[in-house]
């Protein structure tokens, strides 16, 4: 028996020959399997959530809490949206310390959006709910992800809400009341002006792995039981 000693380089895969292929963008082939074929259970759950008479405004999806998976779910939801592109929201008019709200008449209005699906794997309070800023006496209102998802769907990782339970409590309140109220993030520093609340309606998909789902179900047993459930 002949024993041949190999150098470590002989054991390294030859990737140089395939660099040109790796550099090419991935093109979806018309023969690629559809999402409904590969994930029929998840597809059905999304159809239930998007139904006008859905049993719940919340959906729990067991999947890795990574942006790639959240975006895949978002893409699937977009294909099912029958009202995509519908103008919703409003416009805040700020005059000194007086703020008024009117209905949106254009997508350029500061709190208007076209119904869509918004996904986020990690957010802070200002990113999710927007904020009020004051500089040299001038007041500006900044919309958050909930305003972008108004009339549509917000997809968010459970770990974000489990790590920041106050975010979850406020998000749940917004969904249940279908209204957004402006509140200070720090109770010791109240808002300098009164801001009218605005109608806000959205559905939420909470994405988490087994441990996150178990923790959430322990925290929200009733909502977890009522929510639409599926797995990726």
Describe each model-derived feature in a short phrase.
Residues 1-218, 222, 228-232:
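Conserved ASCE/P-loop NTPase catalytic core
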């Amino acid at each position: 028996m002949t024993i041949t000693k190999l150098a470590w380089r002989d054991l390294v895969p030859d990737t140089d020959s395939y660099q040109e292929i790796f550099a090419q963008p991935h093109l979806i082939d018309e023969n690629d399997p559809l999402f409904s074929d590969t994930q029929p259970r998840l597809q059905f759950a999304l159809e239930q959530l998007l139904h006008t008479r859905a049993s719940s405004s919340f959906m729990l999806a067991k999947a890795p809490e990574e942006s790639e998976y959240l975006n895949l779910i978002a893409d699937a939801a977009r294909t099912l949206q029958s009202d995509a592109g519908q103008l919703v929201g409003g416009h805040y008019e700020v005059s000194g310390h007086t703020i008024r709200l009117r209905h949106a008449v254009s997508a350029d209005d500061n709190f208007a959006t076209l119904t869509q699906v918004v996904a986020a794997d990690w957010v802070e309070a200002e990113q999710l709910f927007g904020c009020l800023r004051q500089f040299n006496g001038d007041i500006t209102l900044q919309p958050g992800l909930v305003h972008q998802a108004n009339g549509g769907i917000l997809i968010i990782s459970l770990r974000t809400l489990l790590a920041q339970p106050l975010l979850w409590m406020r998000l749940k309140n917004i969904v249940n009341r279908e209204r957004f109220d402006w509140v200070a993030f720090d109770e010791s520093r109240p808002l300098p002006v009164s801001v009218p609340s605005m109608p806000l309606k959205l559905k939420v998909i909470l994405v988490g792995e087994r441990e996150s789902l178990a923790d959430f179900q322990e925290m929200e047993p009733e909502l977890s039981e009522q929510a639409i459930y599926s797995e990726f």
